[in-house]
């Protein structure tokens, strides 16, 4: 039986990255639910398209056991994350990431996804692919220059243009 995936979409989210995951999951019969890293289900893509997703991240807290994997879908919200780190939805984001990681669930992400995983301490000793500008921020994991890395339960890609290099392995692991 296919696994169930919690997809985190920051606001704004990179639509190119988000929809690669969603379309691949849909086409392969993998169940997913999209959670806005926001206080509302209405978010935007980097290009301004309005999306209404399934739920908000606050409602994922405490329900981590209902999912087998977590996707962090990056976007323009990440470069300004530090300015908004104390917002309840970003506090929830970090708690949810840490909980999924500590439970050994599949951790999937691109661009700054590995950096967000690393901030929680769950990447210790794991090879991760991350956006080149975020590479110096990796303190626990091992940042590489590869387009994507798969190390244990971590599936990471440098950016939305390299998700395709890991997506077949992500789908295989989720089926």
Swiss-Prot record:
Taxonomic source organism: Bacteroides thetaiotaomicron (strain ATCC 29148 / DSM 2079 / JCM 5827 / CCUG 10774 / NCTC 10582 / VPI-5482 / E50)
Binding site for Zn(2+): 74, 111
Oligomeric form and interacting partners: Homodimer.
Role summary: Binds flavin derivatives, such as lumichrome, riboflavin, FMN, and FAD. May act as a flavin storage protein. Appears to lack proteolytic or chaperone activities.
Domain of life of the organism encoding this protein: Bacteria
Gene Ontology cellular-component terms listed: cytoplasm
UniProt key word Cytoplasm: no
Gene3D superfamilies: 3.40.50.880
Residue positions binding riboflavin: 161, 164
Family matches, as InterPro entries: Class_I_gatase-like, DJ-1/PfpI, Prot/Nucl_acid_deglycase
Disulfide topology: none
Alphabetic keyword roster: Flavoprotein, FMN, Metal-binding, Nucleotide-binding, Zinc
UniProt protein name: Protein ppBat
Gene Ontology molecular function: metal ion binding; nucleotide binding
Pfam families found in the cross-reference section: DJ-1_PfpI
